[in-house]
Amino acid sequence: MPYIIEVVQAGRTVEVMKYYSSRYGKKGIKRGERKALTKEEQIKVNKRAAEKKLRRLINENFQEGDTHLVLDYRKERRPAGRKEMREDADDFLREMRKLYKRHGIPLKYIHVMEIGKKGALHHHLVINTPEEISQQAIVRCWKGRGRTHHNPLDDTGQYAKLASYLIKQSDGMLRSPDALQGKRWNSSRNLRKPKVLRKEPVKDKGWYNRIARLPKKLEQSYYLDGDSVQEGIHEKTGYTFFTYTFIKNNQTWKETELEWEKL
């Protein structure tokens, strides 16, 4: 039966997803029971989609040497709620834009606010941090509200664990009484979007291939992220899906999109 293949490039990563859909002839393909989702199941589906979107956004726009920045508060400077936290973040980002502008560099960021179960308040940001921008200068932009924790991104180009962590930290914001439309993060407008290399139905007489494999010409330029391989049944459609990610290790190789047609 036909299945859908989706191939998305985000920075050094290429994500592959294969799944069945009722739009493309389900005869002969067994699926789980399709039913209305409970509130908890819908939250799980939405959370997984948000994590995928955030992972791709980080992978596309940030790299080794950039920073996962955490801002916390002194006890006497703690804001009363989400609105005040947002105002503090806006002020910090204004100061950061001024700082970067002085060096002729655009600021790129993703911002997540955290309200912990015990009331802890933090701001998480993923920011570009070129050599011209010092940690001390960033600290000054926070204006003594609390500490700043600087965590440099590694050289893998795959920041799935960071995206998962940030989505988890954003859960508290959705529980906040003044949460707006379940929005988990804000970002600068200058971020690039991941590139969809393929998204189309594939004619096949049986099940899709459950092997995460590369086109032969790309075997020396990419490697499989073993942690990314997942197979399951989508809660909403009842159909199976299979997904995995390759990471580029040869920065000089310039593949063409046609080579991804061979998956």
Predicted region positions:
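Right-hand nucleic-acid polymerase module
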Residues: 1-119, 129-263
